[in-house]
Amino acid sequence: MTLNKKTNNENSSKTTPKLSKETDLRNDFASKNYVFNPQDKVFQIAQVFGITSAVLIKKLLQLGLKADVNQTLEKDIVELLAKDYNIQVSEPQEKHTPPQLQPQTPSLTKTKPNQKLNLQKKSPIVTIMGHVDHGKTTLLDAIRKTRVVDQEFGGITQHIGAYQVEYQGNKITFIDTPGHEAFDKMRARGAKITDICILVVAVDDCVKPQTLEALKHAQKAQIPIIVALNKIDKPNNNTQQIMQELSSYDLLPEEWGGTTPYIAISALKREGLEKILEIILLVSEIQNLQANPDQKAQGTVIEASLDKSLGLVATFIVSDGNLKVGDIVVAGASYGKIRSMEDENKKKLTKALPSQPVRVAGLKEVPQAGDIFYAVANEKQARQIVAEKKSQTKENLAKTLSPLNLEDILQDLETEKPQELNIILKADTQGSLEALQGMIAKIKVSDLKVQLLRAAVGTITETDIAFAKSSDSLLIGFNIKPASSTLKSAQRQEVKITIHNVIYRIIEDIEQKLKSMIKPTFEEVVTGKVEVRKIFNISKVGNIAGCYVTQGIVNNSDFAKVMRNDEVLFKGKIASLKHLKDNIKSAKQGYECGILLDGFNDFEINDIIETSKLSKVEE
């Protein structure tokens, strides 16, 4: 599009430069095409979309991006926004003059256009993906020459970890995304921040659904994929089958004329690792990865948790700029001043450069894994940004979060409704919490419901116990250790606390609890038949039918149905079962017995009595 270049007050959000006639015609005729111009600012793009600048800024905030009316946007961000208005974004036919950004305007581009001279080569960020147990963490540990796998519970990496290694003088940052489908959100977020994806497939197995999920995440983000064919030391080798199947998903091997590198490795025996690292460096060289280490930092939150000594800590990966101790940062819906910073080896740092993973302390609230973080000018600006974000998401959060008002919950519990299992969930990190919430939401046992009343990061507190007691809830903790005083308090108040380090155990516990809540269903099962051959009248007792058991077994606890000429005369309980004068528990086929019924005396010879019992139907 052609924009009016005569805009004298671009610094003022109140003055909106007028678009050219060509742009006006695009709006008048609801044009579906917009030629991307890196000079276009937020207010200009908003006019093309036919919306106000405020609406566009709100949409950016919902994406976790802070902008003002005079800010430029990256093409991929514009394309994402344009989809909502059915507008196609195309490349310009000729190069545009680099725009002059206003001073102190935070940019959403990876590098500010007026700082291109400061661009420097940056290390690649590599995500290791694949199916559970195919060897992702083993590969990462082999590269780091450490052992972490044995410390993990259940054979699954519980959280995303980020680490930096050095090979031939070049640094490479690795992200290990958990392989189980429960961590789908975390894996998807991991794919968004990475430069290269290593897709691990075990050759003694096959391509799994999780393999394809990981593949699709990477392809959707247009990330180069390197396939690591792991466990080549195993006797069963399905390499050709795996290559053929992955080829159908546009991962044609180089040796077959494609562009996807397939590397045979044994992570356990550390075979093929150098080849993997060489290919990573080669791919990153082709990508020409660059960043500006002089500007304010921005990047992605990898994980967040509570530390006993530091309080709330978060793992950041810096994608651009320079993050320093003392910086004010916004991370999702949280903000704070960086008090301390350390690398994966707990070495204290004063700054972090592009592609570097660091653990920081100083945020006021727990951010979510995958949130964008960026440094801002001061705390006042950070507060304003976060306040606006929270205002925008308040309605959505209200729909997704369970009620926390105790009076409302108690009133809800008193009303008639389908049986529910109330749960209060506490976890060590935000990533674990999200994974558990997702899996709990999928639990289905009969028509019973799981009501997640509260879900939060941190250990179990006295408040949680009081809340669980009042709402009759099951209190579940994942990978946390409550204080002994808290456990004693729960015991005194008869509040059950379940603590696990393996997610599946929690899910199994919930399912078992739900099954125990199911109201049993019974069916009538015929136990025996008898023929009335004599009638005995006992004073003060009534008539006793002298019977011969023709079929099955008659029990003294059975129900009885008296039939005459195929007509049912009575249904009721056996009051007494006798043999001669003795009370007996049962009488088998071919034996005689006396039956006294509760509420029926009008027996006749040749009546048939059918006995039955109620049997619980297994779900």
Swiss-Prot record:
Q: Which InterPro entries match?
A: EF-G-like_DII (IPR053905), IF2_II (IPR044145), IF2_N (IPR006847), P-loop_NTPase (IPR027417), Small_GTP-bd (IPR005225), T_Tr_GTP-bd_dom (IPR000795), TF_IF2_bacterial-like (IPR000178), TIF_IF2 (IPR015760)
Where in this protein does the record put region Disordered?
Answer: 1-24, 90-113
What CDD domains does this protein map onto? Answer: IF2_eIF5B, IF2_mtIF2_II, mtIF2_IVc
Pfam families associated with the record: EF-G_D2, GTP_EFTU, IF-2, IF2_N
Span list, region G4: 230-233
Q: Where is GTP bound in this sequence?
A: 130-137, 176-180, 230-233
Q: Where in the cell is it found?
A: Cytoplasm
Q: Does the keyword Protein biosynthesis apply?
A: yes
| Region span, G3 | 176-179
UniProt KW keywords: Cytoplasm, GTP-binding, Initiation factor, Nucleotide-binding, Protein biosynthesis
Write down any Gene Ontology CC term: cytosol
- What sequence ranges are listed for the domain tr-type G? 121-289
Which segments show compositional bias classed as Low complexity? 1-18, 98-111
Stretches the record annotates as G1: 130-137
Q: Where is the signal peptide?
A: none
Molecular function GO terms recorded: GTP binding; GTPase activity; translation initiation factor activity
- In which broad location class does this protein mainly occur, judging by the first location in its UniProt entry? cytoplasm
Renumbered to this chain, region (G5) spans 266-268
Q: Where is this region: G2?
A: 155-159
Question: What SUPFAM superfamilies would the database entry show?
Answer: Initiation factor IF2/eIF5b, domain 3 (SSF52156), P-loop containing nucleoside triphosphate hydrolases (SSF52540), Translation proteins (SSF50447)
HAMAP family cross-referenced by the UniProt entry: IF_2_B
The record's family statement is: Belongs to the TRAFAC class translation factor GTPase superfamily. Classic translation factor GTPase family. IF-2 subfamily.
Q: What does this protein do?
A: One of the essential components for the initiation of protein synthesis. Protects formylmethionyl-tRNA from spontaneous hydrolysis and promotes its binding to the 30S ribosomal subunits. Also involved in the hydrolysis of GTP during the formation of the 70S ribosomal complex.
Q: What is this protein called?
A: Translation initiation factor IF-2
This protein's species is Onion yellows phytoplasma (strain OY-M)
Gene from which this protein is expressed = infB
